[in-house]
Every structure is written in structure tokens, then in C-alpha cells.
Amino acid sequence: MRFEEEIGSLQMLCDQFQNKINTLEKQMNEEKKDYVQKLHRLHEKNGEAIDKMKQLDHTMQAVSTKVVHLGDQLESVDQPRSRAHDAHQLMQHFDEFLSDQPLNSMIFTDPDKLLESADLVHKLYSISQELNKDKFANVQARIGQRYKVVEDLLIEEFVRSQRDEKKMAEVAKILSEFKGYSGCVDRYVDFLCQSIHPRGDGGEILADCLQLCRTQQPRISAIFPSPHTVMQKLVLNIFTGRMKETITARLRECKDTDDQEHYLRDLAYLYSSTLKMCKELEKLHISPDSAFLSTLTDSIFQRYIATYCSEELKYLNDQCSNLLQRFYESKKHVKKQIGGGLHELKRDVAARLMNVETYGGETFVAEDVAISILQETKNAFGRANQLCDKEELPRHVENIVDVLLKYLYGEHLDYAVETGLAGISLAESKTEPPAYFFSVVAKCTSVILLMIKQFEDPIFPIIKETIVEPSVAKKWQQSLRSLESKMSLGLERQLNSIVGYVKFLFSEQKKTDFRPDSQQIDIRVSPQCQLASRFLANQVAAMELGCDGENLEALQSDLATRLFKFMLTHIQQFTYNSTGAVLLLCDVGELRTLVSKWRVQNALTQWESLQALTNLLAVLPDQVNETAHSSLLENVDRQLIHDFVRLRTDFRSIKNFQI
């Protein structure tokens, strides 16, 4: 029962909502109908408005056509009237000049009408120049006089209006028709140039000139009717005036004081600075002529650049010569003539006769002098890049390279090596040979590395792929190879002298030294070996200071091998008893210890085998066979082992000796 009541209530609610829905739908349909009707009416009104706009546009076009036509008609009527009026005014004012009376028209007497008066006078002047001179000479003179007065007044007005660009522009426009316009421009440009004052090393004035052009270009464009002409005039005055005066004075001062270094340096600096300034001026579009700025630059520098190459080479020759002369004077050394086959022959003969001069161990190589010469040539290469044209540059660089090779290679390094070679005796010396040639090699090598660095930059980038590249490279390589060849020859001779002196020291050993009768003697390194060891240690120390890397290893290996061969031969000159063999072991051990410090493995193996061979002389007779077959003697010739065993005084008593 209750369920049916609820269903009934819901049915009533449903009916109520349905009635509301029906009412709202009816209302919506009515409003939709009204909206459509309004939209239709608005569409019709819009169409009418468009039609009216088209009619109005057509009417405006028709009216504008009539107005333009009417304007043309009025203009065609007005122009003749205007010209007639102007002609009438000119005739009236011309009459004033024809009469002998003073000019009374307000246009001539009112200072405020100067511009109108100037325009009128210019026209009258132009007309008067077309008249017959005999008939109108007086009026021409009078108009010309007035023309000059007005022209002067315009220039004065222009100068007086410096702070009023608008007024200056008005005056300049009128004045541009007068003959004195160029004079006005000149005065204005001169006025601007007065703000430039020489200062510093010359570079500051270039910066001032550039800044002046940058700041004045907008002002000139606003004032003058032809600003490009005025800017060209300004730049022309700058170049031919203050700039040229300052640069010329600066370079003349260097010439007057004979300061060639500062002359070349300032020339390169000022020229390169001027080129940089010209690049900045090109951004301002000063002139339509692309050669305008370069022509002005040439007008200042051409006479200096024309002689630059010869002056650069003269300066380099003088400077390098003076550097070397001062160095040799500081060493109190008078250079000897070197070079050529005759000199080498004399040098070798003197060396063989032991008539050598060591100059107290002086190397005659100065790294500071070499650096100074390299710096001078480096500066010269930089100046050449700035001052030489592309066609002339490679040849000039080759000439600078020739100067560098002449003095640094020929007059300094080659001379030092030749002098060092002359100080090495080719005979077996009885006095301790000096070790300074290693220092010569060390210093020369350092300078060569600096030279190679300069060749890589800046020389090679300049000459690369030019006509002089092959010849410069050939000269450079020949010079360095010649120097390296002489240094190698000197090192070879130095090793010979070292081994020769060691031979001399050991030559004082006697046969009895290794066959002492007494067993009660000190077992120690022989005095001769001690002297040789100290001597070799000093030589190798100098060698290590003078050489490094593979060169040092090769030298030490060669020296160790030569000493090994000498000792091998020297040992076989004597016979040994057991005590003498122990003494010999001390000598060989001393030299082996010295060689072991050189870190040359191949040579050390030789000395270990030599010590093993020497040990054959010291062991007991019944141990000789065993010692002869030790691992240290595996690679030693069996005959050599046999020869060593025969050096024992008790060789014949050894039983069952087999190799």
C-alpha cells in the first residue's frame, strides 16, 4: 500500500516537471523566432549600408578626380603668375641697381631678411653675367659688389650660428649656390681640425682624428647639403695637416738622432695604426672612391716605405754586428778568420801536433746574444709583414733570413764550433783534455731549437707557397746540417781525446805491477785507474750537462765500448799472478761501477763480461774450468777466454783445462 502511494507521488512530480519542460520549450521557440526575424532585418540593413558605401566611394572618386583636375588647372595658371611675379620683382630690384641711388628696399636693408636677400642677389648676379659687359658694366660691378657683401654676411652668420644646427643648415643651403661656399667649408673644417693636438707617440692623434670624424659626421649631414664632400674635405685636411705633420716630425726626430731602431719601430706602428684607422673610416662611407683613403695614406708614408727594405737590412746588419762585437770584446777575444778548406787543414795539422788553443775553456756561445739577434729578426719579420706589399714581402723575408744565418749561424755558432774543434787535440794527449766542447754542443743545441722555432713561426708562414720557399728552406737546412755535422765531428774527436788520455794514464802501469813478489800489499784500485776514473767522471758529468736523450745515450755507449776495447787490449799486455789478478779486478771493477751509472745496458753487459774474464785470472787453478763456463761468459768468444787464461803465470800448471 505504501509503495503504491510513493509511486503516485513520483508520478505527480513527473507530470509537474513535464509541464515545466513544455512551457520552457514553448518560450524558447518563441524567442528563437523573434531572434531570426531580428537577424533577417539586420542583414537587410547591412546590405543597404554596403550599397550606400559603394555609392559614397564612387562619389568621392569622382570628386577627387575633379579636385585634382582643378588643382592642375590652378597650378598651370599660378605658375606663370608666380614666375611673372618673381620676374617683376627681379626687374624692380634690377632697376635699383641700375640707378645710382642707394639700395632702399627692405630686403636689402633688413638684417633679418638676409637669406631672402641672398637668394635674390644670387639670381640677379646670374642674370647680370649674361648681359653685355660693355653696356651693363656698372650694374654688373654693383651687383657683384653686393654679391660679395651678402656672401661675407652669410659666412659670418654661419660662423655665428655654431650652436644652432637648424640655422646653420638654412645658411649653408643658400650659401651652397655662392662662390664662397667652398671657403665656408674650409673655415668650418679648419675649425674642427683645431681640436686635434699632437701628443704621445703619434698613435693618440690617430685616435683623436677617428673620434672627430665619428662625432662630426651626423652634425655635418644635418648642416650641409652635400655632406659627403664636406666629410672628404675634413678627412683630407686631417691627413695632409695634423696627421702628416705629427708623423713626419716623429720620424724626422728619429732620423736626426740616428735612432734607427725607433725609426723602424715607429714607422711600422704608425703605418699599421693608420691602416686600422682607415678601416674604421671606411665604415663611415666617407667617399664613393674606394682608393680615396689608400691614396691619402700613400701620400704620407710612400717615401718612407720606398726605402724601408734597404734601411731594415742595414739596421739588422749593424745591430747584429754590434751585438757580436760587444760579446767578443767582453771576452777580450779577437776573432780569427775561419772557413774554407785551408783553414780546416791548418786546424787539423795543429791538432795533430798538439798545438791547440783552448781559450781557457771559453765556449764563445752566448744564449743571450742569440736571443737578442732572434728578437731583432723577429721584429723585422713583423715590420716586413706590415710595410711590404705582397709581391715584395717574400724576397725581403729571404734577405732577413740571410742576415740571420750570416750572423747567428756563420759569425757566432759556426765560429764557436770551429773554435771548439780547434781546441781538441788529435794526438794522444799527455795532459788532461778539457771538456768544454760538450758545453759548446749544449749551448749550440739550445740556440738551434730557438732558430727552428722562429723558422716555424713567423718565417715559414710568410714564405709558404711562394717563389722563395725552396731557396730559403735549402739555405736553412744546409746551415743546420753543416753545424750538426761539425758538432758530431767535435764529439767524435772529444771521445778520441778522452780515450787517448785514459790510454796515457794506464801506459804508466808496469808488468811488475801485476806480478808482485810480496803477498802483503794493499789490495786497492791502482793510482792510474783512480786518476782515470776521476777524469772519466768529470768528462761524463760535462757530457750529461751538454747532451741529453738519445744523443747522450749514444755518446756514453760509444765511450763505454771504446774503453772496453782499450782495457781488453791493455789487460792482454801483461801476465798476472794471483795477487796481481786481484789488483786488476779492482781496476776493472772501478771502471765497471763507473759505466754502470751511465744507464747504457749494452755497454754494461760488455763490462760485466770483461770482469768475468778478469776473474779467470784470480780464481784458483782448479776453479778455472768452472769459471770459464759461467753464464757471464756464454756469449764470449772461446778463443778470447783461452787467451785470458794463458795470461796467468801458473797457466801451465792448470790441469785438464778445456774451453
UniProtKB/Swiss-Prot annotation:
GO cellular component term of the entry, any: exocyst
Coiled coil stretches, renumbered: 1-58
UniProt entry keywords in alphabetical sequence: Coiled coil, Exocytosis, Protein transport, Transport
Top-rank taxon: Eukaryota
Pfam families: Sec10_HB (PF07393), Sec10_N (PF20667)
Gene Ontology biological process terms from the UniProt entry: exocytosis; Golgi to plasma membrane transport; protein transport; vesicle tethering involved in exocytosis
Family: Belongs to the SEC10 family.
Subunit note: The exocyst complex is composed of sec-3/exoc1, sec-5/exoc2, sec-6/exoc3, sec-8/exoc4, sec-10/exoc5, sec-15/exoc6, exo-70/exoc7 and exo-84/exoc8.
Functional description taken from the UniProt entry: Component of the exocyst complex involved in the docking of exocytic vesicles with fusion sites on the plasma membrane.
This protein's name: Exocyst complex component 5
Organism, scientific name: Caenorhabditis elegans
Lineage: Eukaryota, Metazoa, Ecdysozoa, Nematoda, Chromadorea
Gene (name only): sec-10
